[in-house]
Amino acid sequence: MKLTQGMRTIAAASLGLAALLPPALAQQTTKVDFSDETVGAESKSFLSVVGVWRVEQEGAKKVLAVDGRQWKEGQSSAGIADKARALYGERYAEFLDRVQAFAYFPYTVAKDVPDFSAGEIAVRFEGISGRIDQGAGILFNLKPNGDYLTVRANPLENNLVLWKFERGRRSSVEWVRNTPTATRQWHDLKVRIAGAKVEGYLDGKRYLEHTLPQPVSGRIGLWSKADSYVYFADYAVTPAK
């Protein structure tokens, strides 16, 4: 078929537009809804590894809360051995040893996503209290040895940080300042992953972009820090095609 000049123009415009769009995402988005869960209990959709995580009532809506008001470093969650087995099967021992040795930061793991390597992870959060921290993070790239990455916001610091936790030590990978994040207000946090490329969004604006040495692959969840008391809601996972 012979292309007319008009058809060529349309085709060129379409290609140009495609280059500007993010990688195509699958239609199937997994959303976590806490409406049928029991207030005061751990969520059925997550396995709490470090710290205290439970379903709470916030107005007419149920949310997942991390409660660090009585935080003690080294506080792995109740039933951690069984949870480690549920996450990693026969390889649970290494994960369990790392968690018990380095339970420095509260985190919980999504049950139904055994491996995430590309796409989007989003959540809404509200910092309720915390004198030291009000950390709200999306955890990803969790390995059987306990290493992971997290992009976290913090209403006390107004920054967005990509942290790496490796061999029991935390270090910053990318740090972005001046990201307005008021406490006691709901905010949208999103991570977009494509291979080794990580983008961090806060309230719809991209603040962070970093290329890792290796592609992302591992379990995902939520992360926090110290005495943070934070609500989470509308956790959604959209894998790339």
What do these predicted ranges mean?
Residues 2-14:
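Bacterial N-terminal signal peptides that target proteins for export
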Residues 34, 121-123, 184-200:
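Short tryptophan-centered beta-strand motifs in secreted/extracellular beta-sheet-rich domains
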Residues 69-166:
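Secretory/extracellular carbohydrate-interaction modules
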Residues 33, 215-241:
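Ligand-recognition surfaces built from glycine- and aromatic
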Residues 201-221:
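Short, solvent-exposed beta-strand-to-loop segments that form ligand-recognition rims
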Residues 166-188:
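Short, aromatic/His-centered strand-loop micro-motif at the edge of beta-sheets
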Residues 22-26:
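Sec/Tat signal peptide C-region and signal peptidase I cleavage site
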Residues 41-91:
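Extracellular glycan-recognition surfaces and repeat-rich motifs
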